[in-house]
Structures are given as C-alpha cells and as structure tokens.
Regions:
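Catalytic cores and adjacent flexible loops of soluble metabolic enzymes
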Residues: 1-244
C-alpha cells in the first residue's frame, strides 16, 4: 500500500501556493510518498496548478504527483497540460460514455494532446476501449440510467463562480426542483411571476458565493460541499418565503 495525500484544490484568499506547499511539506514529512492534486470541482486555474506542481517537484523530486481534475467548468484539459509540463506523473482520465460532462476528460483526447506536446505515452488498445465502453453503456442502460441526471453530461462555465463539484449537481437540482414548486406556489398567491429553474439556479450560485467565505472557505468537497449547498438552499428558501 502506498501512502498518498490529497490536496483539495480551490480558489480563495486562503488557498495560496504557499498554503498548499506548507501542507505538502507536512504530509511528506509524515510519510506520504504521493501527492494527489484533487481538483474535485474542476475550478483549479491551470497556471496555478502548474506552479504548484513545479514547487512540489522542485523541493521533493522523489514524490509522485497525480492530477485528478473534473471537466465540469471546462478547464481540465488546459490544467492537464500545465501539470504535465511541470512534472506531474499520473493523470486521471475516463472513457465514454462516462467521460466529459462533470467527470474527467476522455483518455483518447488526453493522449492525443500529450503526444502532440512531445510526451511519450502508451498507445490505446482501441478494441479494449470499445469493449469497456460497450459494457459500461450496457450497465447504464440496465441500471444506472435510473439514477444519472442527463445534465451531468453537460459542461457548464457557471460552476466556476460557485465552485460546487459536478458530482453533487444531480442532488442539488433535485433539491432545487422541489424548492421551486414551494416558492412558486407562494409567488402565485401573491400574484407574482413564477421563477424558472435557471432563475433559481443563478440565485443559488450567488448565495453559495455569499455563504462560502462566511463558513471559512472550506474546499467544496464532501461533506463541506453539502454543508455549504444546504445552507445556501435554506437561506434562499427563507428569503423567498419571507419576502425579504
């Protein structure tokens, strides 16, 4: 078993390069042999991630660095290129039908990009890829299709502002849908126009941006993403129900 530490990536006045480097120094001193840059919401800025990778590699060249970045806001391919050019050793990818959307970039695209950049990367066994693709699609059709929100296959730049990870978008949209019904019933009684899901989604993202610094800028990964999202939802419901 290899001891690995994950640094959860986010953007805030607290989460500077020096902040992350200090944590990396501590966990390496405690025995970590690998560092994973866990960009769970895909909001890590490519240049920042490249600089952090280089800082760790320059000081601890023996440490394996892995990049785990989700595709949701659309920065992941640029981030992969930056971390690889600065010494990253491992990149997390996905295959169809689960790649892209709120998941990871597809391994075919990543390999193509890295080859063009001059990296030596293994060829893909396309027969194995297509077999795994078909098996995964069959499993989704039989079971997971009941649970996967189609919106999870869509990338959205809106995620950059709120910093919420794509993995919780399904539950958040379900919560928002139920809340919308309650809010619109109240608005209807007052003679006010109904709010669309887009109206509420933007208001929720704005509320997340308001709540997040007030709870200490926690990286929005489980369970903190749920805490912040739920506080924002309750605030939004209270605002609309009270009319203030």
């Amino acid at each position: 078993m290899t001891p690995q530490c994950a640094l959860c990536i986010t953007n805030s006045p607290v989460h500077t390069l020096e902040y992350y480097m200090n944590i990396a120094d501590q966990v390496i001193a405690a025995g970590a042999e690998e560092i994973c840059l866990k960009d769970m919401a895909g909001i890590g800025q490519p240049a920042f991630l490249g600089k952090l990778t280089k800082m760790i590699k320059d000081k601890h060249p023996e440490i394996i660095i892995q990049y785990h970045g989700h595709s949701g806001p659309g920065l992941s391919m640029a981030s992969i290129l930056e971390v690889c050019n600065n010494g990253a050793d491992i990149i997390d990818t996905a295959i169809e039908p689960l790649s892209w959307g709120k998941v990871h970039p597809d391994v075919i695209s990543v390999i193509s990009m890295l080859k063009n950049e001059g990296f030596e990367v293994p060829e893909i066994n396309m027969s194995a890829y297509m077999k795994a693709r078909a098996l995964t699609q069959e499993f989704i059709d039989d079971w997971l299709g009941y649970f996967i929100n189609p919106g999870n296959k869509i990338m959205s730049s809106l995620l950059l502002g709120c910093g919420l990870p794509g993995g919780m978008m399904g539950s958040m949209m379900a919560d928002l849908g139920g809340m919308r019904t309650t809010i619109n019933n109240v608005r209807k009684k007052k003679g006010e126009d109904e709010l669309s899901m887009d109206d509420l989604l933007i208001k929720l993202f704005d509320e997340v941006e308001y709540v997040w610094p007030r709870v200490g800028y926690p990286p929005l990964v489980t369970p903190f993403s749920q805490y912040v999202k739920n506080i924002a939802l309750m605030n939004l419901l209270t605002i609309f129900m009270s009319g203030t």
